[in-house]
């Protein structure tokens, strides 16, 4: 019989998530996976919502390797590396962005958040704008991964035509084909670089008035 501790339940939950997706993940299926009776799960998670709240933290612990700035790191480099690492973590599991969306920081995450905020403040951001910048990047990552994972799910539909094939003009046909060739990574990096460039202009304007 599987030793049922919280870590074992979460690990099995992540495996099941990859197999069936968020909508089809149930405590009944999880109990079957663990070869236990469903009530045994309630010692650790009272319901599916409680389980889903725990999965994002496990994803980030496992895959988000750049949540903290390195010594003497440029703030722009940190924001980009942090975002790329966060994106990798969400993409590593099916419906990763959907599960993460709407979650709030828990006590173990407060130390990381404070370190990030203090780092940006030392680089010329006021505390409020440091939080806004971090939130903007986080929301951009989650939103883009939501779109990407939804698109990946659509592509599994048989005989689904490419967008470029449906374009009404040759201009759009060529453009859409180029965008599809470039892929999601190029589009994501463009948006992220644009965000960070905007933060730099706002930061410079504030420093110029001090």
Swiss-Prot record:
Residues 3-63 form the HTH tetR-type domain. Induction: By the [Mg-tetracycline]+ complex. Residues 26-45 bind DNA. Tetracycline binds at residues 64, 82. GO terms for molecular function: DNA-binding transcription factor activity; metal ion binding; transcription cis-regulatory region binding. It comes from the Bacteria. SUPFAM superfamilies: Homeodomain-like (SSF46689), Tetracyclin repressor-like, C-terminal domain (SSF48498). Mg(2+) binds at residue 100. The keyword Cell division does not apply. Keywords: Antibiotic resistance, DNA-binding, Magnesium, Metal-binding, Plasmid, Repressor, Transcription, Transcription regulation. GO terms for biological process: negative regulation of DNA-templated transcription; response to antibiotic. Signal peptide: none annotated. TetR is the repressor of the tetracycline resistance element; its N-terminal region forms a helix-turn-helix structure and binds DNA. Binding of tetracycline to TetR reduces the repressor affinity for the tetracycline resistance gene (tetA) promoter operator sites. This is Tetracycline repressor protein class G. It comes from Vibrio anguillarum (Listonella anguillarum). The lineage of its organism: Bacteria, Pseudomonadati, Pseudomonadota, Gammaproteobacteria, Vibrionales.
């Amino acid at each position: 019989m599987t030793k049922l501790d919280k870590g074992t339940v979460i690990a099995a939950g992540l495996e099941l998530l990859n197999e069936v997706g968020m909508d089809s993940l149930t405590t009944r299926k999880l109990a079957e996976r663990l070869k236990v009776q469903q009530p045994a799960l309630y010692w650790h998670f009272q319901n599916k919502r409680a389980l889903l709240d725990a999965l994002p933290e496990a994803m980030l612990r496992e895959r988000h390797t750049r949540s903290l700035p390195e010594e003497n790191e440029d703030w722009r480099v940190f924001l980009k590396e942090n975002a790329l690492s966060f994106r990798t973590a969400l993409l590593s599991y099916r419906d990763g962005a959907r599960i993460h969306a709407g979650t709030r920081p828990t006590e173990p995450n407060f130390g990381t958040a404070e370190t990030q905020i203090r780092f940006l403040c030392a680089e010329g951001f006021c505390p409020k704008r440091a939080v806004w910048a971090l939130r903007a990047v986080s929301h951009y990552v989650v939103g883009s991964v939501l779109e990407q994972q939804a698109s990946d799910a659509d592509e599994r539909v048989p005989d689904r035509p490419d967008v470029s094939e449906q374009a009404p003009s040759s201009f759009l046909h060529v453009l859409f084909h180029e965008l599809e060739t470039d892929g999601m990574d190029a589009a994501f990096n463009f948006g992220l670089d644009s965000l960070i460039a905007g933060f730099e202009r706002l930061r410079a304007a504030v420093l110029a008035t001090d």
